[in-house]
Design a protein with these regions (language model features):
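Mixed-charge (Asp/Glu-Lys/Arg
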Residues: 1-168
């Protein structure tokens, strides 16, 4: 059995998983994150912002902040630019005084989206960052974050526990 999004039932749970992933980042010894503040958009139209995160990072001299606008797309098909229409991403980033925009996908973005993000990264006069995680990338990150398994992937968690118990 492998970790898969099959256990995630809908877009709200996918957003919750994404938010919890960022909340749990501060507990990881593999980074210099000292605090993470997560703000979900709530029910209704979100205008392209599902989650707003503010991360405090220490470089051993000073703590600095990074703010990201995150949009989650829990769809079976690839995410195309039509799924992002009606959102002026640079304006959205600016309106939240953020550093960048992260698109988290269940599947993957189309070449149109990846090319759009490449152009925005190269030519954005405000030097905002435009990133995406496809489903495989996000699953790899989640796999390392065992604190999320029991809540969001109970079948996978039970499978792993049964293997661990057999080894005892």
């Amino acid at each position: 059995m492998t970790l898969a999004f099959d256990e995630i039932q809908d877009d709200k749970i996918f957003e919750d998983l994404t938010a919890e992933y960022f909340r749990d980042l501060k507990d990881s010894p593999d980074n210099n994150i000292t605090n993470v503040e997560v703000k979900a958009s709530g029910e209704g139209s979100d205008g392209g912002r599902d989650i707003l995160i503010e991360i405090d990072i220490s470089d051993d001299i000073k703590v600095f902040k990074r703010k990201w606008v995150i949009q989650c797309k829990f769809r079976e098909d690839s995410i195309s630019t039509t799924h992002l229409k009606g959102i002026n991403i640079p304006t959205l980033i600016h309106s939240y005084n953020a550093h960048g925009y992260l698109l988290v996908c269940k599947t993957r973005p189309t070449s149109g989206v990846t090319e759009l993000f490449e152009r925005l990264n190269e030519k954005c006069k405000d030097q905002y960052q435009y990133e995406y995680w496809n489903g495989t990338q996000f699953l790899k990150k989640i796999l390392l974050m065992e604190s999320l398994h029991q809540t969001f992937f109970p079948k996978y968690f039970n499978y792993v526990q049964s293997i661990k118990n057999k080894k005892k």
